[in-house]
Regions:
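Residue-level recognition of phosphate/Mg2+-coordinating polar/acidic sites
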Residues: 2-142, 151-153, 158, 172-177
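N-terminal Rossmann-like FAD-binding beta1-loop-alpha1 element of flavoenzymes
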Residues: 164-172
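Active-site metal-binding loops of divalent metal-dependent hydrolases
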Residues: 145
Length: 183
C-alpha cells in the first residue's frame, strides 16, 4: 500500500465498511491528511514483468481468468481491479501500470468508537523525564495516553507496558519510595 510517499507492505481485510489491517495502519497519518491510497497488486513483480506476462496470448480466456493465471491474482484482487481500475486499459504496459498502483477510493477513516488504536494524546513536551505532567504534579501518563503514532499488536502492548513501568517507577520515586526495592 502507498499513501503520499509512505509505503507499507502488509495484509488487509476487505469488509463491508472498507479496508483494515496491518498494511494500512502505518499509513494512517498520511490518510488523515487526505493522501490518495494505492495498492500494488503484484509487489514482487516489476511493471515490465507484469506487462510481459499479460502480453502472452490468452486464447478464449477472459481477461480476469488470464490475469488470474498469469499473475496469480486472487478473487479479491481481481474484484478490486475490476471495480477501481475501470475502464481497464487494453495495452499490457498500461494495464501493468494500473496493477502496480491501483488507486483505492476512500471517504475517510472509521469513527473513533470503532478504532483499534488512535492518534493523539498528551504531547511529550508537556511531560517531565518521568512522564509526569509538568502542569499537574503527581499525574503520570503512559501507553495510549501519550501522543504518538502507536503501532498495533505486540508492539503496542510492549510500548504500553514499557511506558507504564517507566511512569510507575517515576511515580514511586515521586512518593518517596525506591522503585529498586520492589524488583
Amino acid at each position: 500500500f502507498q499513501a503520499s510517499k509512505q509505503i507499507s507492505r502488509g495484509e488487509a481485510i476487505l469488509s463491508a465498511t472498507g479496508l483494515e489491517g496491518g498494511g494500512l495502519y502505518a499509513l494512517s497519518p498520511a490518510l488523515r491528511q487526505g493522501a490518495s491510497l494505492t495498492v500494488d497488486l503484484c509487489p514482487d513483480l516489476t511493471q515490465d514483468d507484469i506487462a510481459q506476462r499479460i502480453d502472452r496470448p490468452r486464447g478464449k480466456a477472459s481477461w480476469s481468468n488470464h490475469l488470474r493465471k498469469k499473475l496469480r491474482l486472487d478473487k479479491v484482487q481481481l474484484a478490486l481491479l475490476a471495480e477501481c481500475g475501470r475502464p481497464l486499459p487494453d495495452q499490457p504496459a498500461k494495464l501493468a501500470a494500473v496493477i502496480k498502483a491501483l488507486r483505492l477510493p476512500y471517504s475517510g477513516l472509521r469513527p473513533l468508537d470503532e478504532a483499534i488504536s488512535v492518534a493523539g494524546g498528551v504531547p511529550f513536551a508537556a511531560l517531565d523525564q518521568g512522564l509526569m505532567l509538568q502542569t499537574m504534579p503527581s499525574v503520570f501518563c503512559a501507553g495510549e495516553m501519550l501522543d504518538w503514532e502507536a503501532p498495533t499488536g505486540g508492539y503496542l502492548l510492549t510500548a504500553c507496558f514499557a511506558t507504564g513501568r517507566w511512569a510507575g517507577r517515576a511515580a514511586a520515586r515521586y512518593c518517596g519510595h525506591d522503585p529498586q526495592d520492589t524488583e
